[in-house]
Amino acid sequence: MFVEDKNFSWSSKYNPGTDKPFIMSRSKIDLYLKCKRCAYLDMRLGIKGPKPFPYNLNSRIDYLLKVEHDIAREKKEKTKYLEECNIDAIPYSHPDLDVWREPFKAARYHHKETNIVVAGSVDDLWEDNQSKKIHIVDYKSTHTENFEKLKNFDAPYLIGYKRQAEIYAWILSKLDLDIHQISYFLYVNATLEQKTFNNKLDFEYALIPYKMRDFNWVEDTIIEIKNFLETNKIPAATNDCELCKYMHKFFEFIKKKN
């Protein structure tokens, strides 16, 4: 069972030389891989970027999907998604699952070499009926006219979702779960067929499999981030970082005005 460790806290920034573990969320790893300057400002200096827009409707859909799966979990049977897609698995039961799903508790692994606690909140887990291995499952909701194209799961922006699954897989493998190489994205899409609102939205869905890479890259990245956070030099801006480009133009404008 999960026991809260009082030595762990969601620190605002990393303090070099401290013996207190630093909790690093899955999103911070992703931030580091996207833009090292933004990651340094965030994790080392405590200067956060703008908060993402709150996707309240998406959160509600996630909640309802979890309820559906929890009903099936209690009965030890498939959901309609697993049944209709011929996936031989059922929602996985574990005493810590509710904790692993909760954002500010989450699934955590203390990487002793770096003294970093890596944390991530999973949406769901399925157990393969044959191998008994565990599938990582993530819920996604959207509205797109190109849902068929999305199902190919090869757009460049989706790399973040793929990394997300692999980070969860790494954490849970360290918590002694036998992880299946195939993870699933349960995507729901608001349909184009609906012509009027009538206080509801109609959705179609797709269950998209993703064959994960060897997720041991996560540990290499954690060690890299640890060394990165120990330095005192702010990295150069990343060319394709929208926030860095905005800040560059902003300061150029201020200089001209002054």
Tell me what each language-model feature is:
Residues 1-133:
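Metal-dependent nuclease catalytic cores that hydrolyze phosphodiester bonds in DNA/RNA
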Residues 15-18, 23-24, 171-258:
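Metal-dependent nuclease catalytic regions and adjoining charged, substrate-binding loops involved
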Residues 40, 126, 135-139, 180-187:
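A structural signal for short, well-ordered beta-strand segments and their strand-loop junctions
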Residues 46, 140-145, 190-192:
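Short connector loops/turns at beta-strand edges and beta->alpha or beta->beta junctions
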Residues 54-55, 147-159, 204-211:
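Short histidine-centered catalytic/ligand-binding loop motif
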Residues 109-163, 218:
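Non-catalytic protein-protein interaction segments used by genome-maintenance enzymes to assemble
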Residues 161-173:
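An active-site-proximal "capping" alpha-helix that borders the catalytic cofactor pocket
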